[in-house]
């Protein structure tokens, strides 16, 4: 099976980090590749960044469809363009937020999410509600660190995350922690060992979920909601399924 990971932002080093996390957990017979658009924001921090990232991400999926990709992972915790991506792809499309939340609800009764900036908190709160986890998610927290700073100063990021995890355990009663940014994936194992609480990385969760769905023979339903887009002209261009 071939799983393609798409980082919707244009920072190639972040794409490489997410791919490294995926390669560590994939099945021996699974092929995982990765890419990112080159004309999208360097990081996705808010609704405007999300909107600007979606056309490039959909183009990556269309290219993957032509190459025979079986499933896709959208490696941004805001799950930008997830529903649109499922319209374009034949196989499963997994958002890392949805995957991480599903894992958290499966292995714990209550969990907290820790993300980068405070402006991302309401976006993630809405996603948690959409995914049916509002009763289980005790709090969405932020370490007030920009996404790109996770790579620029990983030691500081780790210190801030460790502190916030301990607060979440004490104040939220969190039994598991979800890392709310793909750029945190490389820190997951160390954070779990240091805090003694399950720490869930969405990239890992999404790759394993994609493998499970493909192994069971599931594809994206093309009945109504996720049917292929109708072909039509748009500003002189043809919108292709």
UniProtKB/Swiss-Prot annotation:
GO terms for biological process: amino acid biosynthetic process. Belongs to the HyuE racemase family. InterPro entries: Asp/Glu/hydantoin_racemase (IPR015942), Asp/Glu_race (IPR001920), Hydantoin_racemase-like (IPR052186), Iso_Racemase_Enz_sf (IPR053714). Homotetramer. PANTHER family: PROTEIN DCG1 (PTHR28047:SF5). Pfam families: Asp_Glu_race. This is Hydantoin racemase. Its EC number is 5.1.99.5. Inhibited by Cu(2+), Hg(2+), Pb(2+) and Zn(2+). The activity is twofold lower in the presence of Mn(2+), Co(2+) and Ni(2+). The insignificant effect of the metal chelating agent EDTA on the hydantoin racemase activity would indicate that it is not a metalloenzyme. The activity is gradually lost at temperatures of more than 30 degrees Celsius. GO terms for molecular function: amino-acid racemase activity; hydantoin racemase activity. It catalyses: a D-5-monosubstituted hydantoin = a L-5-monosubstituted hydantoin; D-5-benzylhydantoin = L-5-benzylhydantoin; D-5-isobutylhydantoin = L-5-isobutylhydantoin.
């Amino acid at each position: 099976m071939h799983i393609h990971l798409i980082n919707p932002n244009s920072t190639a080093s972040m794409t490489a980090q997410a791919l490294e996390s995926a390669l560590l957990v994939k099945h021996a017979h699974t092929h995982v590749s990765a890419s990112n658009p080159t004309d999208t924001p360097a990081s996705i921090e808010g609704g405007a960044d999300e909107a600007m990232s979606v056309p490039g991400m959909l183009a990556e999926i269309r290219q993957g469809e032509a190459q025979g990709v079986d499933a896709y992972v959208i490696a941004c915790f805001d799950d930008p363009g997830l529903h649109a991506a499922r319209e374009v792809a034949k196989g499963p499309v997994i958002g890392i937020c949805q995957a991480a939340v599903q894992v958290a609800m499966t292995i714990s009764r209550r969990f907290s999410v820790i993300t980068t900036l405070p402006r991302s908190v309401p976006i993630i709160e809405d996603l948690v509600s959409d995914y049916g986890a509002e009763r289980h998610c005790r709090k969405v927290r932020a370490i007030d660190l920009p996404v790109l700073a996770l790579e620029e100063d990983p030691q500081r990021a780790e210190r801030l995350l460790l502190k916030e995890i301990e607060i979440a355990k004490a104040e939220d009663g969190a039994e598991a922690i979800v890392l709310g940014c793909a750029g945190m994936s490389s820190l997951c194992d160390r954070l779990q060992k240091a805090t003694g609480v399950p720490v869930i990385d969405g990239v890992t969760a999404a790759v394993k979920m994609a493998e499970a769905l493909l192994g069971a023979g599931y594809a994206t339903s093309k009945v109504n909601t996720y049917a292929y887009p109708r072909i039509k002209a748009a500003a002189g261009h043809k919108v292709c399924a």
